[in-house]
Amino acid sequence: MISPHSILVVDDEVELATLFKTFLENQGYDVVSFTDPVLALEYFKETFDKHSLIITDLRMPSICGIDLAKEIRQINSKVKIFLMTAFEIRDLKDNEDFKQARIDRLLQKPVRFDNLEQMINESLNVLNIQ
């Protein structure tokens, strides 16, 4: 089944970006992936109303996932944003920048795809209801 939702994946690790893109396309989503967060942001500025969900890594060169999310929020406040990290999630929740970015979900790496699929369905179903 093809989903009406489009997902933007941003991870500086080529293998992970490719893995996420392949998995999500197999779930029926239209997926665009970037390994450079600056290019992803430039692309998003041009296509801000196309994507329902952004999945981004936390630690990347040139711009971190939180700063990317804050920039995206200024462009489109309704898009859902998932932030992935291999580091301790607890430390993020009290971070002021994290709060300003209004992250919808935190994903602990390695990400289990069955959990990811459930989180995506829950988040995008909310969009369908609104």
Task: Show which residues each predicted segment covers.
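Receiver (REC) domain active-site loop signature in two-component systems and cognate sites
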Residues: M60
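Two-component/phosphorelay signaling modules centered on CheY-like receiver
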Residues: V14-V32, A101
